Amino acid sequence: MTLRPALLLLTASLVAGCVSTGNVDPMKTGKGRDEARDAYTQLGIGYLQEGATERAKVPLKKALELDPASADAHAALALVFQIEMEPKLADEHYRKALSQRSGDARLLNNYGSFLFEQKRYQEALERYQQAAQDTLYPERSRVFENLGLTALMLKQREQA
């Protein structure tokens, strides 16, 4: 084979390879679905931060359709329902988030705050104690403050 036909064959195969890979649906790959889930979750959190809880539910629901076990989407929905004063739904989503990441100090602290708000002080104390075990958690001082307030509510002044 001469050089010219060989180069032509090589170029044709490269072009064919480029064309065939351009047709892949990113939602059919694990990476694509993970990126979409994360984008939907971030969008929902953005709406939540703006106080638009109803709007936050739509992308968070889509995130959970892509990954029903997403701890971040469940945690964000828990906050949505907590703000909307739907304690049963908030509790359900906090539990689902923690079932995926049981040692996550941020989740434990947020769930503890929810439990405190519901006057479930003993449960709140337990969540805060779990969160305090993470010595690298950046909000650890807040966890100790929450522990003290909860101990006071439980009339455990020596712990406070």
Residue spans for each PLM region:
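Bacterial Sec signal peptide processing site at the extreme N-terminus
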Residues: L14-E35
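Structural marker of alpha-solenoid helical repeat scaffolds
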Residues: G32, L66, Q100-R101, D134-L136
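Residue-level recognition of tetratricopeptide repeat
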Residues: A36, S70, D104, P138-R140
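Canonical tetratricopeptide repeat
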Residues: Q42, A76, N110, F144-N146
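TPR alpha-solenoid repeat register
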Residues: A73, L107, F114, S141-V143
